[in-house]
């Protein structure tokens, strides 16, 4: 049986940069901010220390979450016109006393997004969620990193 070696910091850093490229493709501002934060974190902990393997593991887990679970929305170009029509309907409803909310127009406009779902995103169906863990008990460790959580029983 071959022993698996932990990735070195450079491998983890490259994996994290690839994950940011996949997750934030087309959004230069967010991509730049994510990469700057990754660089800052790796630069702050440049020297090898006792916690280096834990930090490498954290970077790998962060990259995996970015790659498989982060979906960005893009504002649909025609959303403004439909939001305007929707707003005029709301004004009529408010006048008649049928509606009392305040930021409905803005919420409607903000809700009109197209999601960027790429091939790496985890997909599941509701049946797998409903049946998962029905007969299992899981202890959740509060205040610990994801890699330190243990399931029991």
Swiss-Prot record:
Q: Which domain of life is it from?
A: Eukaryota
**Where in or outside the cell?**
Mitochondrion matrix
Q: Give the coiled coil ranges.
A: none
Q: Does the keyword Membrane apply?
A: no
Q: Which GO terms describe its biological process?
A: mitochondrial respiratory chain complex III assembly
Q: Which GO terms describe its molecular function?
A: protein folding chaperone
The stretch annotated as transit peptide is: 1-56
Q: Where is this chain primarily localised?
A: mitochondrion
- InterPro entries in alphabetical order: Complex1_LYR_LYRM7 (IPR045298), MZM1/LYRM7 (IPR050435)
GO cellular component terms, alphabetically, are: mitochondrial matrix
What keywords would UniProt list here? Chaperone, Mitochondrion, Transit peptide
* Subunit organization: Interacts with RIP1.
Query: What family is it from?
Result: Belongs to the complex I LYR family. MZM1 subfamily.
Q: What does this protein do?
A: Assembly factor required for Rieske Fe-S protein RIP1 incorporation into the cytochrome b-c1 (CIII) complex. Functions as a chaperone, binding to this subunit within the mitochondrial matrix and stabilizing it prior to its translocation and insertion into the late CIII dimeric intermediate within the mitochondrial inner membrane. Modulates the mitochondrial matrix zinc pool.
Entry's PANTHER family? COMPLEX III ASSEMBLY FACTOR LYRM7
Q: What is this protein called?
A: Mitochondrial zinc maintenance protein 1, mitochondrial
Native organism is Ajellomyces capsulatus (strain H143)
Gene assigned in the entry: MZM1
